[in-house]
UniProtKB/Swiss-Prot annotation:
It comes from Alkaliphilus metalliredigens (strain QYMF). GO terms for biological process: DNA recombination; DNA repair. This is Holliday junction branch migration complex subunit RuvA. Gene3D superfamilies: 5' to 3' exonuclease, C-terminal subdomain, DNA helicase RuvA subunit, C-terminal domain, Nucleic acid-binding proteins. The keyword RNA-binding does not apply. Residues 64-142 are annotated as: Domain II. Belongs to the RuvA family. Residues 1-63 are annotated as: Domain I. Pfam families: HHH_5 (PF14520), RuvA_C (PF07499), RuvA_N (PF01330). It comes from the Bacteria. Residues 143-146 are annotated as: Flexible linker. HAMAP family: DNA_HJ_migration_RuvA. Keywords: Cytoplasm, DNA damage, DNA recombination, DNA repair, DNA-binding.
């Protein structure tokens, strides 16, 4: 309904932004990330999504299209409403959240307000195929931690008599950054025994 709003920023709080457009002040619910990027007294553009429920109507807006796109993906997940989605985007950038989804890191996602482990796992299940590499941000520590765990799992499996190829296949099949190396080894052994 509303693609974007361009107007004077009148107020910016933790989770909302007031924008004046043609003499009308619109309250736009947002993430902490977007609210912290706007400047009071300046003209800004917010990319918006209108949420209409039985008893209420809300406008959600973000400073960039990537955050709006991730917001729309999040609210498409069952049991994640717009308020929880905005809270998740207050915790992580869309790119970092995308990295956690792609790497099955339910533990990191569950650190967001209103998100438990089951909701995080459901989010990963429903969104993993909808995230492309341009929407993902990895830093060197992210890769180092993941590779270290994988290498340790492969080494342990080789010490138990499996080939390097078998170890790599099993480690790849059970990769989960929320698990300790020991738990991944156990899961890899179960996977190999199937």
């Amino acid at each position: 309904m509303f693609e974007y709003m361009k107007g004077m920023i009148v107020e910016a709080q933790i989770d909302k932004i007031i924008v004046e457009v043609n003499g009308i002040g619109y309250r736009i619910n947002s993430s902490i990330n977007s609210a912290s990027q706007v400047k009071i007294g300046q003209v800004s553009t917010l990319f918006t999504h209108f949420v209409l429920r039985e008893d209420e109507a809300h406008l959600y807006g973000f400073v960039d299209k990537e955050e709006l796109a991730m917001f729309k993906k999040l609210i498409s997940v069952s049991k994640i409403g717009p308020k929880v989605a905005a809270g998740i985007l207050s915790t992580y950038t869309p790119q970092r959240l995308g990295a956690y989804i792609v790497s099955n890191d339910a533990q990191a996602i569950a650190k967001s307000p209103g998100v438990g482990k089951k909701t995080a796992e459901r989010m990963i299940l429903e969104l993993k195929d909808k995230i492309d590499d341009s929407q993902v941000e990895y830093d060197q520590n992210f890769f180092n931690h993941e590779n270290k765990n994988n290498n340790e799992v492969v080494d342990a499996l080789m010490a138990l008599g499996y080939t390097k190829h078998e170890g790599e296949q099993a480690a790849s099949a059970v990769r989960d950054t929320s698990l300790s190396t020991e738990e991944m080894i156990r899961k890899a052994l179960n996977w190999l025994a199937r």
